[in-house]
Amino acid sequence: MDNTLVDNKYTYTKELKEWMQNLKEHKIKLFILSNSPMGKVVKRIAGELGMNYIYNANKPFLKGYKSIIEKSKVKKKHIMMIGDQLFTDIWGGNRFGVKTILVRPIASTEAFITKIKRPFEKIVLKKYYKKKGEID
């Protein structure tokens, strides 16, 4: 959620809300899978965007991902994880066996723990792009 859907002040764009509504109209089930322990904040954002949610997910561990299947009754092959953090969102999604999309963070301001991880993500991504070719 943080830096993927909303900025560090927990605000989102009108376009995001419209996109979420369009996806729902096409019968796509939407979940926020957040490591945030702030259930009230996650619940508020999810409610405003018309999404289901799981907070305190402990990504990259698999419990949160499994909860999505339990709550949605959707097969793993129909799930996609979209996130801005390589070592939580993407690694967890890949370990769980779902498709993943790594996006750029919305804001430059990040939580302390995320700031610590970003240099290591850059090392991994640099090696990946060197091997596979950069996609922009």
Regions found by a protein language model. Name each.
Residues 82, 87-119:
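Acidic, Mg2+-coordinating phosphoryl-transfer loop and its flanking beta/alpha structural elements
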Residues 74-76, 95, 110-136:
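C-terminal cap/substrate-recognition subdomain and adjoining C-terminal extension
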Residues 61-86:
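Conserved Lys-Pro-Asp/Glu-containing loop-to-beta segment of HAD-superfamily phosphomonoesterases
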Residues 48-50, 96-97:
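Short, structured coil segments at secondary-structure junctions
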Residues 4-12, 16-46, 56-59:
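Substrate-recognition element of Asp-dependent hydrolases with the DxDx(T/V) motif
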